[in-house]
Amino acid sequence: MNYPHPIIAREGWPFIAIAAVVALLVHFIAGFGFSWLFWLLLIFVVQFFRDPARPIPTQANAVLCPADGRIVAVETAHDPYANREALKISVFMNVFNVHSQRSPVDGAISKVEYFPGAYLNAAVDKASTENERNAVVIEMAGGQTVTSVQIAGLIARRILCYVRAGEPLTRGQRYGFIRFGSRVDVYLPVGSRPRVSIGEKVSASSTILAEL
């Protein structure tokens, strides 16, 4: 599913409209001296839901970062969604990051699975297994499997996923959104070479997470 509006995420349009109407009403009723705070809030809401276009690396064996944020885990772990041992790389998104998720690789979706759960701080490790989450398992043409998991956080309470099993995905394609801070775990085949380290800031699509 191609996303036709690359500047402001459509998920934010209702919030932007409400903030704009409130700012205008206060401005007309009470003047700028009272409404400036609401205009500032509108600016914050617009920047929060920004969704800029990103350059997409063309390196054939590259796994792209699915989200903006900070790397909080690079480790060997069990991938419960594809039932295998894997290299796990986790990205934590705070409230100031872009909140759309993009496909890390080209492939076909073999499974989309949703799990209800808790709303722990998404930066902690147990959020991967205890929080509300949605897993997308992607099978690549070369036989490799890549799993991308959207995980809700302490404030984020709604995971949006726009793809289904059987559909194709292309690297950098926008496939989901999580509001107000969250986490994305990526599980890669054992032997993949990580290109990021813990604490590093990363950008969706333009940062290479690892090489297969």
From Swiss-Prot:
Entry's Gene Ontology BP terms: phosphatidylethanolamine biosynthetic process
Family: Belongs to the phosphatidylserine decarboxylase family. PSD-A subfamily.
A GO cellular component annotation in the UniProt record: plasma membrane
Record text on subunit structure and interactions: Heterodimer of a large membrane-associated beta subunit and a small pyruvoyl-containing alpha subunit.
Post-translational modification: Is synthesized initially as an inactive proenzyme. Formation of the active enzyme involves a self-maturation process in which the active site pyruvoyl group is generated from an internal serine residue via an autocatalytic post-translational modification. Two non-identical subunits are generated from the proenzyme in this reaction, and the pyruvate is formed at the N-terminus of the alpha chain, which is derived from the carboxyl end of the proenzyme.
The record's free-text note on cofactor binding: Binds 1 pyruvoyl group covalently per subunit.
Sorted UniProt keywords: Cell membrane, Decarboxylase, Lipid biosynthesis, Lipid metabolism, Lyase, Membrane, Phospholipid biosynthesis, Phospholipid metabolism, Pyruvate, Zymogen
Its job: Catalyzes the formation of phosphatidylethanolamine (PtdEtn) from phosphatidylserine (PtdSer).
Source taxonomy: Bacteria, Pseudomonadati, Pseudomonadota, Betaproteobacteria, Burkholderiales
A family per Pfam: PS_Dcarbxylase
Catalytic site: S182 (schiff-base intermediate with substrate)
Record-linked HAMAP family: PS_decarb_PSD_A
UniProt topology in membrane: Peripheral membrane protein
Parts forming coiled coils: none
Record NCBIfam families: PRK05305.1-2, PRK05305.1-5, PRK05305.2-5
Chief location category: membrane
Domain of life: Bacteria
Name listed for the protein in its UniProt record: Phosphatidylserine decarboxylase proenzyme
Modified residues (Pyruvic acid (Ser)): S182
MF terms (GO), sorted A to Z: phosphatidylserine decarboxylase activity
Site entry: Cleavage (non-hydrolytic): G181, S182
Cofactors that this protein relies on: pyruvate
EC number: 4.1.1.65
Gene label: psd
Reaction(s) catalysed by this chain's protein: a 1,2-diacyl-sn-glycero-3-phospho-L-serine + H(+) = a 1,2-diacyl-sn-glycero-3-phosphoethanolamine + CO2
Pathway(s) served: Phospholipid metabolism; phosphatidylethanolamine biosynthesis; phosphatidylethanolamine from CDP-diacylglycerol: step 2/2
Compartments reported by the entry: Cell membrane
